[in-house]
Amino acid sequence: MKITAAILVMAVLFCTVSFLLVQTSIGGEMHIRGFYREPKESLDVVLFGSSEMYAGYSAPLAYKNAGFTSYNMCFEGAPGNLYKSMLCETLKNQSPKLAVVEVNGFFYSEETMKQEARLRKWVDSIPLSANRINTINENVEAKDRLPYYFNIMKYHSNWERTDKISRRITAIDTINKQGVSLMKSFSTKTTMDEKLPKKIGPKKLHDYNIKVIDDFAKYCESSEVEDVLFIRMPHCLKLEKKYDDMISQTVEKYGYKYVNFDNYFKEIQLTKSHDFYNPEHLNVFGNRKFTNFLSDYIKNEYNPAGEHSPEIEKKWLECAEYTENAFSMLEERTLKKEGKYYYEFSDYSQAGDKTE
């Protein structure tokens, strides 16, 4: 009996220490953790992608504008080869009528997609499950898997980084106290880049990238998601048309649509000098404009809004009000070019972070 109790105590301590020492990206982890705070079967739309998505689209403001519930299941630098795992994880708790997929994650090279840091941002932020194990096994060679199964092997030396441990626990505590993540998945920088560089490294699609897109679209077709919309968020430099055509041809085989919103600046009323904080990310002004445009598009094309309980509707109204207040403060700070980073778990009564 004493041995059993001792084993249990050791197991609890092991799990607690493993949890405390994990350090990937605080922002990315909170974007993912916030998803699990949403009531089951309460999301009409789930959006997948990387930082462009949660910098440029606000789920609470979309609810206020178009009446459907949604969540950015995203983290910075999310590679397209993980989108299947992200959708699989989503469908455990939600049955969205529509999945929206931002395509930037498909443009990473095969080497970049398989980087340990990108994989760990995802698998170290989700609960232990068959999906987590399968994702590790699909992306890591057998000889290298053990530190992914027992992540204390990776993070054991982090006990010295007390400042980051404290910031991470504070962020988790903030979201937990809110009940749900009030701004859902969100990040911005309070600036407007009036001198955006004219050139960024060109986006290219190779055979590997097309295969990843095709595999994901095929997986979507076999899933329980009713429909999928592939999009490209507005960027300051457009894709070459041949890559738009390659994406369209790939996803249309499965009955899905692709829309490149780089081509809708006039309709959205976006200006590069006012609505972006860097060439690839909208600021809060651009976020508000694009959220209204995309949510109208989704409402008109897919009509995803479902029936929800009065309690859930009340909470979404609270989220929209909280987000409006936060955006008002962020817009003022953006006009002043404060240049700080903010997240859904930030204390908006104080200045944001100097770095991401």
Predicted regions mapped to residue ranges:
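Alpha-helical transmembrane signal-anchor/signal-peptide segments
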Residues: T24-L43
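Loop/turn elements at helix/coil->beta-strand transitions in domains of secreted/extracellular proteins
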Residues: S42-D44, G67-T69, S95-L98, E221-V228, ...
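Acidic-and-aromatic substrate-binding clefts and catalytic sites of carbohydrate-active enzymes
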Residues: G77-N81, L205-N209, P234-K242
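Residue-level recognition of beta-strand->loop/alpha-helix junctions
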Residues: C74, R232, N260-D262
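Secreted/periplasmic serine-hydrolase-like ester/acetyl group-modifying domain
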Residues: E116-E226, S309-E356
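Membrane-embedded segments
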Residues: F48, E52-E138
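C-terminal regions of proteins
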Residues: Y243-Y348
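Hydrophobic membrane-insertion alpha-helices, especially the h-region
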Residues: K2-Q23
